Amino acid sequence: MRGAYYVLIALLVVASSQTSAESGHQLQVYDHDFVAADTAAATTLPRQFLRGSRNVPGDLAHEERAITSELVEEGAKLIPRAAENVEEISRVAEAVGKRPRVAEEDVLNKASGANEAFKKPRNTATDDAFQGISTEQLLPLSYKQWDTEIKSMRIPKPEKYQNNIQSVYDAFVDVCDEDLKPTISETARLWNLFDRSFKPLTTRLHQQALAQFAKEYVLRDELRLKTEWARMNERTMPNRAGMLNMKLNWHFQRWVRMYNKFGERRSELIGTPLNVARSRGGTTGASRGTALHRHSIVPLNAASTSKGKSSVFTERSQRTFDDNTDIASPPSKHIKGQSSELVEPEGHRSKP
């Protein structure tokens, strides 16, 4: 850095010498020890002794030396900062050069993976992706909310899925816990929620539907338990709301459990809309491996023919349902049918 300082001074001195030679005056010896004094003297000179004046030859040299010294000092102050900036730029460039770069193959693989994910249809979610609804959630309703009329939702009748509802119901009963005891009507409602042939609903809307189902059951119990309601009318409003909420959450938790179980096994129960459509048309072959064909729609006490071959009914629990209350009664004893001839239901009869 000192070398650059002296080089700059030498250049300035040479320039001053040339200027003095052109004006006809000789440049005096420059001494660092007297720069401050010369500068102070130069500041007191009047305007008539500026450069170009020939009356006072000595003052011109002093003025030029003072200006030159000021320029040199300012340049010397700026040189370290410029050097630091140059070093900083070199460090940044070196750091950028050492930064690891992503390989082109990784970029191509990520891009191809994104394209494949984008091409997949949205309705290919597996059962593992089913989140379900928490069974710890409660529905606290105030008495004012209970006092208003609860309108029933538009629920499809079981006849909508009458071609396959029995087989889906049988499969659903097998995967449910014993205390749930779902009915055919409840199975049809759950099927309607998971039916992908229509616009899929969100989990929040499903939860609202389950809450509505539970409210309908509370109203049904209200009509059945008139004597108990007569006693409840004598109680205060908060107590009545508490009793209603207790019943509501009992029904709601049951619906949530059935909903989660149906959602976990929906591919086995109803499959895709294409499989359901095929099963409604009575196709055979690979579609028989699904749950829709795994449970044949054959009455337990029915007997019929099938090319003269006989078979024995397997042990199955038979459920009876009350059409008015839609509540399953306790299962009856297992029935063992004697050897008899079976008849395939319509749509599954073997060709001659």
UniProtKB/Swiss-Prot annotation:
Region spans: Disordered: 280-352
Coiled coil residues, start to end: none
Main location: secreted
Skewed-composition ranges (Polar residues): 302-315
UniProt key word Hydrolase: no
Compositional bias segments (type: Low complexity): 280-290
Any one annotated GO CC term: host cell nucleus
Subcellular location: Secreted; Host nucleus
Signal peptide: 1-21
Keywords: Host nucleus, Secreted, Signal, Virulence
Annotated motif RxLR-dEER, positions: 48-65
Protein family according to the UniProt entry: Belongs to the RxLR effector family.
Function: Secreted effector that acts as an elicitor that induces cell death in host plant cells.
Domain notes: The RxLR-dEER motif acts to carry the protein into the host cell cytoplasm through binding to cell surface phosphatidylinositol-3-phosphate.
Protein name from the UniProt record: Secreted RxLR effector protein 122
Protein source organism: Plasmopara viticola (Downy mildew of grapevine)
